[in-house]
Amino acid sequence: MIARVISSVLIVWALGFVWFASTLPQPAGIAQTDAIVVPTGSGGRIPRGIALLRAGAADKMLVTGVDVDVRPIEFMAEFGVDQRLMDCCITLGFSALDTRGNARETAEWIADNDYRSLRLVTADWHMRRTAVELADRLPAEVRVLRDGVPTQPSFATLFGEYHKLLAAWLLTLA
């Protein structure tokens, strides 16, 4: 009996990993949201967020998890952002150190600005855990549009992220 339970758990775990690795979230269309949120991390996230902002997918963007040593002028130079766009539309968040912190920082920013919808822009392999952490912090009425940035993650990245997702999901149940 114990062997069957263990075998069943292992099968569910393995199938879950196959599902996780083979169905990574894709970019969303150009649907309008109140804001765009981009956690710092792997390449492509911030350029995707800026492109969406410029295309009118939202009026404001939060980049969460920015290193405290990064100055806005450096951010602007790195990502080709002009002063007008920076002043009107981009907020740099400096308080988050990890994905959970990104969710906390995002929830505070969303509440402070009374937004009802946001586009979450992050790496495809990072999307599910970020969304779980964010859903745990946001009011249920805030709509989150998932916009995955395509990457070529290694097996190790996928394997590690799958387990972080499981842990995040279990923590939300507690």
What are these regions (language model features)?
Residues 21-159:
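A structural signal for short, hydrophobic/glycine-enriched beta-strand patches
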Residues 17-24, 168-172:
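Structural signal for membrane-spanning alpha-helices in multi-pass inner-membrane proteins
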Residues 3-19:
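Hydrophobic membrane-insertion alpha-helices, especially the h-region
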